[in-house]
UniProtKB/Swiss-Prot annotation:
Keywords: Isomerase, Pyridoxal phosphate. This is Alanine racemase. It comes from Halothermothrix orenii (strain H 168 / OCM 544 / DSM 9562). Signal peptide: none annotated. It comes from the Bacteria.
Amino acid sequence: MNKRITRPTWAEIDLSCLQFNFNQVKEILGSNVKIMSVVKADAYGHGVIPVAKTLVEAGTQRLAVAIPEEGVELREAGLSVPIQVLGEVLPSQYELLFKYDLIPTVGREETALSLNRLAAKYNVVKKVHIKVDTGMGRIGVRPREAVGFVKKVNSLSNIKIEGLMTHFASADERDKSYTYEQWDKFKQVLDGLNKLRIDIPIKHSSNSAAIIDFKKFGLDMVRPGIMLYGLKPSRDLINNIDLKPVLTWKTRIVYLKEVPPGTGISYGTTYVTNRKSKIATLPVGYADGYPRILSNQGQVLVRGRKAPIRGRVCMDQIMIDVTEIPDVRVGDEVVLIGEQGTQKISATDIAEKADTINYEIVCGISQRVPREYKNKIGG
């Protein structure tokens, strides 16, 4: 059954926009830098399998996920490109790395030793990427310990260090000084390894913000994430880049009524009409990922005009005021994220009102919102 028919709330995913954004990354970096496209968290809420297949067809050399289980999903869908697991992996997950040919990110000696034993058991050499924590404070070996750590891991007979990586904490901030500090620490590690003649084929550090603002940090490979989906990491980037949002979120009016002045709207009657008003109900709510914090402050698009949310966002429904919009009818299309006529509401607009980031908005659109895919490569 077509989910789109059964529910008048859906997200449209334009895969031609995804390909456009991927090509923008290639244009910035040139042909000598590999691209590992980040598709964790269900491709940032866009649907991982169609997105991953599109990116592979567009030319990405690798894919990155956060947890092994996401890599398993890609393998079971037939994706054969190298897949790296960016997060720390616990012993209970090690078998998945071998069974599904996933590349772990290693920052602990215990992990390296355990993987080496398992690789010997299976009579294979396991590729790994070493994570250096230059200032994120998350996972990874600290810079002053990194050269010795790499030397030790490099001596393991069933481990092949394919990559060395770090992650920038503040590349999307206006003040770039901390990013330069991180870069200097990473370069010192690379220089130390060069002195020992330890060759690591793939060095990588750049996330979306660094790709846009720090081209020289590209090294051998980059890890674009949010920019692939047409969203900028922040408004504080120095360089401009043309990106096309991949996701549009839509719903339809399911109920329409006129109410007199003094009518309370939604839970807690936090909004009370001060005039005769036309109130429309939408079949979408915070269970679908629309932020409840936008109660009485969010807007949607109806017939090319902005309509304010009235009252609290409910779990499954939202009420909007369409008094000023003529000819509104039940069944009219409503845009939550995207464009309608000359008006636009972006994920970033919603994020700013919700005091969060655009990443959280698109990742938070729940699975009960059907995704419709448009403009697939090759049809």
